Amino acid sequence: MVKAGNETQISEFLLLGFSEKQELQPFLFGLFLSMYLVTVLGNLLIILAAISDSCLHTPMYFFLSNLSFVDICFASTMVPKMLVNIQTQSKVITYAGCITQMCFFVLFIVLDSLLLTVMAYDQFVAICHPLHYTVIMSPQLCGLLVLVSWIMSVLNSMLQSLVTLQLSFCTDLEIPHFFCELNEMIHLACSDTFVNNMVMHFAAVLLDGGPLVGILYSYCRIVSSIRAISSTQGKYKALSTCASHLSVVSIFYGTGLGVYLSSTMTQNLHSTAVASVMYTVVTPMLNPFIYSLRNKDIKGALTQFFRGKQ
């Protein structure tokens, strides 16, 4: 922290992480390193399967490979820095590093939400309008949906970062988290945060609530269409088509709600940090397993790819 006149220029923050007990640090390092490697490897395998097998060159797997890429980036935004801090027994993150981490966190969390909405729309078209699926979900529309998702996420991230850069911080520079989270940084500010809170809550309603409404609407229509199917086998096939996506959506929004409730209902900041692990680390790690465990196409594509390499 560098002082100049009456102004305070922040040079670094302290990330408190989970525990200050030294005996737990090797365990935490091994745990999060393992989870990070599983996340990267699992999502890379999904991308590899979607690229290598021409049978998987469909809208569903195009969106899934994009989601896997975003999950890798999402985990890489936070976990490597946390591992470095644990290994070096340091809690320090520079001001520029903190703003950068916050910027990418906001970018990828919103992009995750938008891509899940796009995938819900894809499921809706596949089940409710199967005869027109290939016409509606054209390569041009698929590319446009992903592009718009990226643009909206980048613009929101830039806006959140710009208004955060206008904040002044006091002497309390401890972030009770393992990464620089937007809400925690606003709480640390000693200047007026009205604009920041307005922008943050407006973006949350628009870019988190909006996609959730879209997903719920899509699944309401999907359930109505499935109920109209006469055969039991047809109903089972339709349900199995969207089961994986519905599981991922439930985990994503369920853990997000858990983090929000834990931060508002408890004063234990470390418990909030632990709850956020489910949201930021565990969910990207589970996604490849959820999509591949019951997916014969992905299993077949990976088996064929590795057999071809032998």
UniProtKB/Swiss-Prot annotation:
GO biological process, any: signal transduction
CDD domains registered for this protein in UniProt: 7tmA_OR7-like
Record membrane topology: Multi-pass membrane protein
SUPFAM superfamilies: Family A G protein-coupled receptor-like
GO molecular function: G protein-coupled receptor activity; olfactory receptor activity
Keyword Membrane attributed: yes
Keyword Transmembrane helix: yes
GO cellular component: plasma membrane
One Pfam family per UniProt: 7tm_4
Disulfide bond positions: 98-190
Transmembrane parts of this sequence: 27-47, 56-76, 101-121, 141-161, 199-218, 239-259, 273-293
Chief location category: membrane
Residue intervals on the Extracellular side: 1-26, 77-100, 162-198, 260-272
Function: Odorant receptor.
Similarity field: Belongs to the G-protein coupled receptor 1 family.
Protein name: Putative olfactory receptor 7A2
Species of the source: Homo sapiens (Human)
Gene: OR7A2P
